[in-house]
Protein backbone atom coordinates (compact mmCIF):
# COMPACT_ATOMS: atom_id res chain seq x y z
CA UNK A 1 0.00 0.00 0.00
CA UNK A 2 1.07 3.58 -0.54
CA UNK A 3 -1.13 5.08 2.13
CA UNK A 4 -3.37 4.36 5.09
CA UNK A 5 -5.72 6.93 6.53
CA UNK A 6 -8.74 6.89 8.81
CA UNK A 7 -10.83 8.65 6.15
CA UNK A 8 -9.90 6.70 3.01
CA UNK A 9 -8.52 3.38 4.25
CA UNK A 10 -5.79 1.76 2.13
CA UNK A 11 -4.80 3.72 -0.96
CA UNK A 12 -2.51 3.57 -3.97
CA UNK A 13 -1.75 6.13 -6.71
CA UNK A 14 -2.59 3.73 -9.57
CA UNK A 15 -6.32 3.25 -10.23
CA UNK A 16 -5.76 -0.01 -12.14
CA UNK A 17 -3.67 -1.37 -9.28
CA UNK A 18 -6.43 -0.40 -6.84
CA UNK A 19 -8.99 -2.29 -8.95
CA UNK A 20 -6.85 -5.45 -8.91
CA UNK A 21 -6.20 -5.20 -5.16
CA UNK A 22 -9.89 -4.59 -4.49
CA UNK A 23 -10.82 -7.60 -6.63
CA UNK A 24 -8.39 -9.79 -4.68
CA UNK A 25 -9.53 -8.47 -1.29
CA UNK A 26 -13.16 -9.31 -2.02
CA UNK A 27 -12.19 -12.95 -2.55
CA UNK A 28 -10.02 -13.46 0.53
CA UNK A 29 -11.21 -15.14 3.71
CA UNK A 30 -8.41 -13.46 5.69
CA UNK A 31 -6.93 -10.15 4.63
CA UNK A 32 -3.41 -8.92 5.37
CA UNK A 33 -1.68 -5.75 4.20
CA UNK A 34 2.02 -4.95 4.63
CA UNK A 35 2.31 -1.29 5.52
CA UNK A 36 5.40 0.36 6.96
CA UNK A 37 4.73 3.13 9.46
CA UNK A 38 5.82 5.86 7.02
CA UNK A 39 2.56 5.22 5.09
CA UNK A 40 0.32 6.05 8.08
CA UNK A 41 -1.67 9.27 7.55
CA UNK A 42 -0.84 9.25 3.82
CA UNK A 43 -3.50 9.35 1.12
CA UNK A 44 -3.03 8.35 -2.50
CA UNK A 45 -5.42 8.69 -5.42
CA UNK A 46 -7.38 5.42 -5.28
CA UNK A 47 -8.81 3.50 -2.33
CA UNK A 48 -8.69 -0.28 -2.57
CA UNK A 49 -9.86 -1.38 0.90
CA UNK A 50 -11.33 -0.22 4.17
CA UNK A 51 -9.50 -1.31 7.28
CA UNK A 52 -12.24 -2.93 9.32
CA UNK A 53 -11.51 -6.54 8.33
CA UNK A 54 -7.79 -6.28 7.55
CA UNK A 55 -4.78 -7.21 9.65
CA UNK A 56 -1.93 -4.75 9.11
CA UNK A 57 1.63 -6.03 9.34
CA UNK A 58 3.97 -3.12 10.01
CA UNK A 59 7.43 -2.18 11.24
CA UNK A 60 6.17 0.00 14.09
CA UNK A 61 2.83 0.16 15.87
CA UNK A 62 2.03 3.76 16.74
CA UNK A 63 -0.52 5.11 19.21
CA UNK A 64 -2.75 6.49 16.46
CA UNK A 65 -3.07 3.18 14.58
CA UNK A 66 -6.28 2.47 16.53
CA UNK A 67 -7.88 5.42 14.75
CA UNK A 68 -7.57 3.66 11.39
CA UNK A 69 -10.40 1.21 12.16
CA UNK A 70 -8.34 -1.84 11.27
CA UNK A 71 -9.05 -5.35 12.50
CA UNK A 72 -5.62 -5.94 14.02
CA UNK A 73 -2.01 -4.74 13.83
CA UNK A 74 1.07 -6.92 14.05
CA UNK A 75 4.63 -5.66 14.30
CA UNK A 76 7.53 -7.43 12.62
Predicted regions and their residues:
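Conserved phosphate- and dinucleotide-binding cores of soluble alpha/beta proteins
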Residues: 1-76
Amino acid sequence: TNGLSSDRGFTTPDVREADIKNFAMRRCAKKFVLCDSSKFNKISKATFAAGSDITVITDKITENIKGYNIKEAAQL
